[in-house]
From Swiss-Prot:
The active site is at C58 (cysteine sulfenic acid (-soh) intermediate). It comes from the Bacteria. It catalyses: a hydroperoxide + [thioredoxin]-dithiol = an alcohol + [thioredoxin]-disulfide + H2O. SUPFAM superfamilies: Thioredoxin-like (SSF52833). One of its GO terms (molecular function) is thioredoxin peroxidase activity. Its EC number is 1.11.1.24. Belongs to the peroxiredoxin family. Tpx subfamily. Residues 16-162 form the Thioredoxin domain. CDD domains: PRX_Atyp2cys. It is an enzyme of class 1 (oxidoreductase). This is Thiol peroxidase. The lineage of its organism: Bacteria, Bacillati, Bacillota, Bacilli, Lactobacillales.
Length: 163
């Protein structure tokens, strides 16, 4: 059971598993352009999904994955949240992570529905991490049971480095 603020929450859709192909998406960047999974073809991808960039755990998650993984060869870290692109851009500037790739699902929540991350009760994304190989096959996934907890950084980082 997944909880948020100590209460059970529900989702629509089926959780993705290791071995599944990642689903395509159309998300909004901080400059209001659109990005899809295809825009990162040929690269290893870490999808770091957070409820809101302006919370402590989400900020820590975004910073840690960017600091530890963005320098890996042929690897991109994509942070996805429901935050407006303006808030994501402001956060990057304030945190000195100007090169972080921030993607917003605010427009139609399709990423959240497709990846079974849209919290029905809150219209926020649940916390999760997906590590994809260059063919967009999921090699590691964690749907965090307690959204107010950090993901398993060590396992996700090890999975990304092993690709």
């Amino acid at each position: 059971m997944v909880t948020f603020l100590g209460n059970p929450v529900s989702f629509t859709g089926k959780q993705l598993q290791v071995g599944d192909k990642a689903l395509d998406f159309s998300l909004t960047t901080t400059d209001l352009s659109k990005k899809s999974l295809a825009d990162f073809d040929g690269k290893k991808k870490v999808l770091s999904v957070v409820p809101s960039i302006d919370t402590g755990i989400c900020s820590t998650q975004t910073r840690r994955f960017n600091e530890e993984l963005a320098g890996l060869d042929n690897t991109v870290v994509l942070t996805v949240s429901m935050d407006l692109p303006f808030a994501q851009k402001r956060w990057c500037g304030a945190e000195g992570l100007d090169n972080a790739i921030m993607l917003s699902d605010y427009f139609d929540h399709s990423f959240g529905r497709d990846y079974a991350l849209l919290i029905n009760e809150w219209h926020l994304l649940a916390r999760a991490v997906f590590v994809l190989d260059t063919d967009n096959t999921i090699r590691y996934v964690e749907y965090v049971d307690n959204i107010n907890s950090e993901p398993n950084f060590e396992a996700a980082i090890a999975a990304a480095k092993a690709l």
